[in-house]
């Protein structure tokens, strides 16, 4: 393997595997490289979202390079994922959002049974977007504009007079925030939060956009949808009038380019079962 490929490979592994377990950088392409994971079984756990799996796959590849015997990953929803880690049914994940999953983390045992390690993906945004064409034509800039019946009707896809918004999967952390926002911003009379299989709903949303129809949806970035519906070209963020979170802890950063998106700017973290973390860190 040439030096350039070696460096790229090391960078890839460092980006997730080292952060996941918070172990020293022991990478090299030589056959004599140290293998801190030799003889250690490790069981990953992922959410049941294909679009999120790539981080786990990178982590597993890196851990195998470090000598760990990586077991078949388990899959479940986010609350159950953290409970499984807490109980020792799995050893690590790279899919926990610092703010969004805070209540799931605490309910699973918090720092008593779990350990947060590396920042896998910082600067994650969430918020509400609409198509730029409609935003420009009707001067829509804020989620509060949807309180106006004549504006809400622009996004009505089933004839009930309400704006149809693509929301979150039931059970996701964002579901709680979106439902809270519906009440906090007075949107319940004019906006319908359509919850279900998010990516199936987004396929319909994208199809509507391609037909030239107005669209309204919750999303987060980075993910693949932002490369299909491009910010500033196809769609724009809507601001919120104030930060209003279910926890009441509103003194957090919810700004993106001077616009309040209403959701904390988040960081995806690696989380380990505490007993497992202590075992692999012993000299």
Q: What do these predicted ranges mean?
A:
Residues 56, 73-112, 204-208, 224-230:
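Pocket-flanking alpha-helical
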Residues 49-50, 68-83, 192-204:
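Short helix-initiation/N-cap motifs at beta->coil->alpha
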Residues 90-94, 169-244:
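Ligand-binding pocket segment of bilobal, Venus flytrap-like solute-binding proteins
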Residues 50-69, 180-183:
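Short, polar/charged alpha-helical segment
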Residues 14-27:
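Bacterial N-terminal signal peptides
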């Amino acid at each position: 393997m040439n030096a350039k490929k070696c460096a790229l490979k090391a960078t890839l592994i460092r980006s997730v595997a080292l952060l996941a377990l918070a172990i020293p950088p022991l990478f090299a392409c030589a056959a004599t490289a140290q293998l801190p994971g030799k003889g250690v079984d490790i069981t990953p756990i992922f959410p049941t979202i294909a679009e999120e799996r790539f981080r786990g796959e990178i982590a597993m590849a890196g851990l195998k390079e470090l000598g760990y015997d990586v077991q078949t990953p388990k899959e479940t929803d986010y609350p159950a994922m953290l409970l499984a880690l807490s109980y020792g049914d799995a050893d690590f994940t790279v899919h926990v959002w610092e703010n969004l999953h805070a209540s799931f983390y605490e309910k699973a045992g918090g720092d008593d049974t779990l350990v947060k390690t590396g920042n896998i993906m910082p600067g994650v945004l969430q918020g509400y977007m609409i198509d730029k064409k409609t935003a420009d034509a009707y001067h829509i800039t804020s989620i509060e504009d949807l309180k106006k019946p004549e504006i809400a009707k622009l996004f009505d896809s089933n004839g009930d007079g309400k704006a149809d918004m693509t929301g979150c999967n039931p059970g996701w952390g964002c579901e709680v925030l979106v439902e809270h926002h519906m009440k906090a911003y007075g949107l319940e009379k004019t906006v319908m939060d359509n919850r279900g299989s998010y990516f199936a709903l987004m396929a319909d949303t994208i199809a509507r956009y391609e037909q030239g129809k107005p669209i309204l949806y919750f999303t987060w970035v980075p993910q693949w949808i932002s490369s299909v519906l491009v910010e500033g070209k196809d769609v724009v963020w809507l601001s919120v009038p104030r930060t209003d979170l279910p926890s009441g802890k509103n003194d957090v950063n919810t700004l993106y380019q001077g616009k309040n998106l209403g959701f904390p700017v988040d960081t995806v973290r690696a989380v380990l079962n505490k007993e497992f973390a202590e075992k692999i860190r012993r000299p």
